[in-house]
Regions:
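Bacterial Sec-dependent N-terminal signal peptides
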Residues: 1-26, 508
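Sequence signature of WD/YWTD-type beta-propeller architectures
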Residues: 19-508
Length: 508
């Protein structure tokens, strides 16, 4: 009996501390070069709670041995194809090495002989990242789609679940999902074309809104929640597309009209200002300061001769004061970020929760920089008033949408850097003085998944927990015949609308 207990304890300890019969190979030669791996994770800085960085070795070899070392018990893995790191032991190793680094050594067996590559490092931050990430998965097309879904991913694992699929909402278009300060229980999104309406989710309840009024250009489009959760700012847009017949670029997307409005949730009323709904301007992409006292937005002069002169459309980022108690805006607009003299248009802004940095996308023209290869990310420091290019994050292809972690230390952004077609998601660190880390591709259980996946990632949004309302509940809400119509407040400025129609484009 004592002998049996001894063996049971031995087996348990081996499972706990990773005892495996990995016989250390006799190395014939040290190659003194780094292994070629995909994704290219070497030198990345990791959140302490990120999923394993599984990778594929692209060099020639019959068998691989990988050793991951740091404080605590090392991980040794043998592989013939993709390298899959045990998730429990990975989490333990990250926890033990936060603020330090891991060393990864790869050895290759070729024709019975072993060769060892130079080790590469992964740095482990003490900063964690929010637990979940929401995004839309859609074919990288311009106007048509077969299926799309808004999904959520647990970032400490590979678990992906559906928030809503258009299979449950009438095969329609679903877009512009946004959360209140990363709260998974407060969410807004739009249904387009079939079962059209805005879906508002609060505390497990779901309601459908008709947001077209006689004083709005269109239904609500790009949203941002006020930090109080009582109001949501929206743009209203008429968006068009033009295609090239002989040009390296494929498409140009632009607004012919756009305004910004404020929706008061409890009052079911809409407000705006002549400074946010100017017929001679295009206003777009509203977002609030963390204290809720400023509304930032993108704006440029309206041009009638489109698409002929879309190269002259260059947006700036401005701000206007906001009184949340009375839903009133100030009488002055201030310009924060202006790159028009440098020949650039600045759009797709987001602000860190601590209010220190504004991330934005700069391109030669327009407001839909996701399809402009020259589009790069910039960072504006609200304390120093300095704007810098996020050189460490940029690539020759388009970088566009950004989302911030709740501790303001991590940014996830979309990039087409791998093939110029599919938007994929990259994670990068920023410290309190603006130092940037190398971005790394969102980890997948199968490291080749992104090379095989035929869906693009659209509009990443970090959230502090899992969205728990069921896809069936959202789908039923979307397909409901009745919807509550919003109304313009009698106390608000009411713009005159010459043309009002729904958008006909779907851009990702």
């Amino acid at each position: 009996m004592r002998l049996n207990i001894f063996y049971i304890l031995l087996i348990a300890l081996c499972g706990l501390y990773g005892c495996k019969n990995h016989q250390q190979p006799i190395i014939k030669e040290n190659l003194n070069i780094l292994p070629t791996i995909y994704p290219e994770y070497q030198g990345a800085l990791l959140p302490v709670n990120i999923a394993p960085l599984n990778f594929k070795i692209q060099d020639e070899g019959d068998e691989w041995m990988i050793q991951i070392q740091g404080k605590g018990n090392p991980i040794t893995i043998t592989a013939h194809d993709a390298v899959e790191i045990p998730i429990k032991r990975w989490r333990q190793l990250l926890h033990q090495n936060q603020g330090g680094s891991l060393s990864i050594t790869v050895s290759s067996r070729k024709k019975g002989e072993w060769y060892q590559y130079s080790p590469f490092t992964l740095d482990v931050s003490t900063d964690s990242i929010d637990s979940h990430l929401a995004y839309r998965l859609i074919e990288p097309t311009y106007a048509n789609w077969n299926s799309m879904a808004i999904c959520q991913r647990e970032l400490s694992s590979f678990k992906e679940t559906e928030i809503i699929s258009n299979k449950k909402s009438g095969q329609n278009c679903i877009n512009c999902h946004t959360f209140n300060q990363g709260n998974p229980n407060e969410m807004v999104m739009h249904m387009r074309k079939i079962n059209a309406g805005t879906i508002l989710i609060q505390g497990g309840a779901c309601q459908k809104l008709n947001t077209k009024t006689p004083h709005t250009i269109s239904n609500f489009v790009y949203p941002d929640w006020h930090p109080s959760g009582k109001q949501i700012a929206f743009s209203t847009n008429l968006t068009q597309m033009s295609f090239y017949d002989a040009h390296p670029k494929i498409i140009e997307v632009y607004d012919t009209q756009s305004d910004i409005v404020l929706y008061d949730i409890s009052k079911n009323e809409v407000y705006t200002s002549p400074l946010l709904a100017n017929a001679n301007k295009l206003e777009n992409f509203p977002f609030f300061s963390p204290d809720g006292k400023q509304l930032y937005f993108c704006t440029c002069d309206r041009i009638d001769s489109l698409p002929q002169q879309f190269s002259n459309i260059k947006y700036r980022i401005c701000s206007i004061g906001f009184d949340p108690q009375n839903n009133q805006f100030s009488k002055q607009v201030d310009t924060l970020i202006d790159l028009t003299n440098a020949g650039k248009s600045v759009t797709l802004p987001s602000i860190s929760p601590d209010g220190q940095f504004i991330a934005c996308s700069a391109a030669p023209h327009g407001c839909f920089s996701s399809w402009i290869p020259e589009s790069d990310l910039y960072l504006y420091n609200t304390k120093t008033k300095k704007l810098i290019a996020a050189t460490e994050w940029n690539s020759p292809e388009a970088e566009s949408c950004t989302t911030w972690s709740s501790n303001s230390r991590w940014v996830i952004f979309s990039s087409r850097r791998e093939d110029g077609i599919y938007n994929r998601l990259y994670i990068a660190h920023i410290d309190s003085v603006g130092n940037l880390s190398k971005p790394f591709l969102l980890p997948q259980r199968d490291p080749t998944y992104n090379q095989r996946n035929l869906k693009a990632y659209n509009l990443p949004r970090l959230i502090k927990g899992k969205v728990t309302i069921s896809p069936i509940t959202i789908g039923r809400c979307a397909e409901a015949k009745g919807k509550k119509s919003v109304r313009f407040s009698k106390h608000s400025y009411k713009p005159l609308i010459n043309e009002a129609t729904e958008n006909h484009s779907e851009i990702n």
